[in-house]
């Protein structure tokens, strides 16, 4: 494994600084490459926004994550569980004062306990078939693309740094030296650019392919809400 190259790092820093003040020339990426990089740069924010909203939707938050760390075997208590428990408690306490209401409260409590089970199954399914897949995309495919982007920028800086040195060469010997370096840099840049472009294309294709995971989410919602509707219809005698 190559070690840290102080000289290259300094040259890249100097080249970038010169570009910021329009002192040094900068090799432009092809339009397609620039467009792909722009899209990839936005993907983390897009995916993170969806993950955060979905985790909130399925009752995953910082508190529940901490609770899971200490009580992995304990089922999470959902809001549906809490409502079912409240209905059950009031049913028991009001049986004498309101027998008909008490009976219906008991039935409603049972309905909510079954819906709570359906909710837990739904939450778990969404976590494994949607959230985890999005996180995996972030941590593997998108991470690889970001590394490729960094590598491409580094070889681009190396190329432009040596072009600047060639431009400022004072002697024939210096000019010959930097011409050779530039030729080598151009070869490296072309190779890394093609490798990076392949990774960028793959990343955008896989990002678009997350539509499959979105359908998994919608399907899980459909099944959950149908289960809840069925429980309610049974109690209503429909």
UniProtKB/Swiss-Prot annotation:
Domain called BAR: residue spans: 18-238
InterPro entries reported in the protein's UniProt record: AH/BAR_dom_sf (IPR027267), BAR_dom (IPR004148)
Domain of life: Eukaryota
Gene3D superfamilies: Arfaptin homology (AH) domain/BAR domain
Pfam families listed in its UniProt record: BAR
A GO cellular component entry from the record: cytoplasm
The protein's name: Hydatid disease diagnostic antigen P-29
Species the sequence originates in: Echinococcus granulosus (Hydatid tapeworm)
């Amino acid at each position: 494994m190559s070690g840290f190259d102080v000289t290259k790092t300094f040259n890249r820093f100097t080249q970038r600084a010169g570009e910021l003040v329009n002192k040094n020339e900068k090799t432009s990426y092809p339009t397609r490459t620039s467009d792909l990089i722009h899209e990839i740069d936005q993907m983390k924010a897009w995916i993170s926004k969806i993950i955060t909203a979905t985790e909130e939707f399925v009752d995953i938050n910082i508190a529940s994550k901490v609770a899971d760390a200490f009580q992995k075997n304990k089922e999470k208590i959902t809001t549906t569980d809490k409502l079912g428990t409240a209905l059950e408690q009031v049913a028991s306490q009001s049986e004498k004062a309101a027998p008909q209401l008490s009976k219906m409260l008991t039935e409603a409590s049972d309905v909510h306990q079954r819906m709570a089970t359906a909710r837990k199954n739904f939450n778990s399914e969404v976590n494994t078939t949607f959230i985890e897949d999005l996180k995996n995309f972030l941590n593997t495919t998108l991470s690889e693309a970001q590394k490729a982007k960094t590598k491409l920028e580094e070889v681009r800086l190396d190329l432009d740094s040596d072009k600047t040195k060639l431009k400022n060469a004072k002697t024939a010997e210096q000019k010959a030296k930097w011409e050779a370096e530039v030729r080598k840099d151009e070869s490296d840049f072309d190779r890394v650019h093609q490798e990076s472009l392949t990774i960028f294309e793959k990343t955008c294709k896989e990002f678009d392919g997350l539509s499959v995971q979105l359908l998994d989410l919608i399907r899980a919602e459909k099944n959950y809400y149908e289960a809840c509707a069925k429980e309610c219809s049974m109690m209503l005698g429909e």
